[in-house]
Amino acid sequence: MWPVFWTVVRTYAPYVTFPVAFVVGAVGYHLEWFIRGKDPQPVEEEKSISERREDRKLDELLGKDHTQVVSLKDKLEFAPKAVLNRNRPEKN
């Protein structure tokens, strides 16, 4: 009797396995839901770093007066002296 049973189970394994797996999965899902309880309240998503940076830059722009800019005539050198005169001791 057992050899016939195992032959039938082996032959029809896909047809037997799927319903058994489906029932076990459904029972496990509902059991886990029952043990865990109600769904937790959704947590507010934290802003990403790029969003926080954009907000900070917008706040900085709002606080500035864009009509007051430094004249190019006031800027005598565009590069710092330390970079250009590093190897020239007579200029230091």
Curated annotation (Swiss-Prot):
Which InterPro entries does UniProt cross-reference here? UPF0767
Q: What Gene Ontology cellular-component terms does the record carry?
A: membrane; mitochondrion
Q: Does the keyword Transmembrane apply?
A: yes
* Record's subcellular location: Membrane
Location (main, coarse): membrane
Write out the entry's keywords from A to Z: Membrane, Transmembrane, Transmembrane helix
Q: Report the membrane topology from the UniProt record.
A: Single-pass membrane protein
UniProt cross-references to Pfam families, sorted A to Z: UPF0767
UniProt record similarity statement: Belongs to the SMIM12 family.
What name appears for this protein in its UniProt entry? Small integral membrane protein 12
